[in-house]
Amino acid sequence: MKSLTLIPGKLSLSQLREVYSHPLNITLDSSAFAAIDESVACVNAILAEGRTAYGINTGFGLLAQTRISTDDLENLQRSLVLSHAAGVGEPLDDDLARLIMVLKINSLSRGFSGIRLSVIQALIGLVNAGVTPWIPAKGSVGASGDLAPLAHMSLTLLGEGKARVRGGEWLPATDALRQAGLEPITLAAKEGLALLNGTQASTAFALRGLFEAEDLFASAVVCGALTTEAALGSRRPFDARIHEVRGQRGQIDAAALYRHLLTDDSAISRSHHNCTKVQDPYSLRCQPQVMGACLTQIRQAAEVLLAEANAVSDNPLVFAAENDVISGGNFHAEPVAMAADNIALAIAEIGSLSERRIALMMDSHMSQLPPFLVKNGGVNSGFMIAQVTAAALASENKALSHPHSVDSLPTSANQEDHVSMAPAAGRRLWAMAENTRGVLAVEWLAAAQGLDMREGLTTSPLLEEARHLLRERVPHYTQDRFFAPDIENAIALLAARHLTRLLPAVLH
């Protein structure tokens, strides 16, 4: 099992992908201990002095004006967790739950939350033991933090709710803790609120969408290059000079990726020497422009989400150096919601452009290939309905890409009167990614079929590798057969990131 030494506020995108991708052991760097202890000492000093501070010895939300006696502070924190665990829907998978917990550990360890090191270590213990809290997918509006999902996460620390160990059966949390060799904990002043308040669920949802978008982008570049070759499209639109004079960095970098794949030393490239074709359709010619714009959106979202993954986003915040506790609004996940909306646009456009290239391949006048990429048309329908499936998926994504950040519903008796809807903004990215992966699967199949039909012509070594990868699982389409398994096989290869390995990373 891999290990990660967590330096608070210093997680990288590659580390976050590692956290999401598989179980690992977390160790908190000792440099964090002093700041954590100082913030707790500040909270204890406020209590000892009899001062009133929101979240430490008051109620919450609209009840913030209610002073809580010292004798009730432990019960206050426990009641907060129990009452706020009100989510609905299917539980999050182990990978997402683990990412949420690590994001929360990272935030709390910055030393601005007034939470004891022992509580943070208890959360680390869940991660290291492979304990997954039952966290329903729905129930947060992304302000005042992701209260419901983080409450469900925190229930497990208290021995409440449900959890499972290393992908096993869901159990009462006390049984899951016992199986993992762990004990329930008791929360002190402010600790329940520190656990519940924050954008970690929203950020994890959007990060999953970001990782999917990065993979889809790379796969789409490979599929688009394959289609360009199958359609005998020109390489000239990828000339670096075109893109340099526009100056759009995403476009420049996207064009370089196409050139990386479309080398000049191939039979198809040599076939263009006496070509009379002047211009290709936009779905081939404008790939660097469209995909470059998508890359820019993905990169900008990555920058926002990386900052949020390392942020302190609970409330109130403890500034121990000044012996001060300040109420603010870092729990508001508007940056995450807008980043997720931008990722949605990129995922939708990647699929939309791919679907147009598939349609081009179906049209014999455009591709100069047999209609629907099959011989003996009429008897055989070939890729006809596969393209319809791609169109259906691309169209569905257009609706799903509607921005969520422009929506808001007031909650908590209008105390929380503007919210981000970041969790929903991030969560819909998963369905969109699945749809676009389906579109790309059809394009990969169609491009490979078209290349097969260009008898005697081969493409570049990298693109031949992409064709070979597919042909190991899916044979050439000689006559009509049950088509769905072919699409599923291509989807599985895409999900396993086989095509992304043909390109350098695009976010770093």
Curated annotation (Swiss-Prot):
Protein's GO biological process: L-histidine catabolic process to glutamate and formamide; L-histidine catabolic process to glutamate and formate
Primary localisation category: cytoplasm
EC annotation from Swiss-Prot or TrEMBL: 4.3.1.3
Record keyword Manganese present: no
EC top class named in words: lyase
Cross-link (5-imidazolinone (Ala-Gly)): 143-145
GO cellular component: a single term: cytoplasm
Pfam families per the UniProt record, alphabetical: Lyase_aromatic (PF00221)
Modified positions (2,3-didehydroalanine (Ser)) in chain numbering: 144
Keyword annotations: Cytoplasm, Histidine metabolism, Lyase
Cytoplasm keyword on record: yes
GO MF entry, a single one: histidine ammonia-lyase activity
Cell location: Cytoplasm
Associated pathway: Amino-acid degradation; L-histidine degradation into L-glutamate; N-formimidoyl-L-glutamate from L-histidine: step 1/3
Catalytic activity: L-histidine = trans-urocanate + NH4(+)
CDD domains reported for this sequence: PAL-HAL
Modification note: Contains an active site 4-methylidene-imidazol-5-one (MIO), which is formed autocatalytically by cyclization and dehydration of residues Ala-Ser-Gly.
HAMAP family hit by this protein: His_ammonia_lyase
Matching PANTHER family: HISTIDINE AMMONIA-LYASE
Family that this chain belongs to: Belongs to the PAL/histidase family.
Protein name, as recorded: Histidine ammonia-lyase
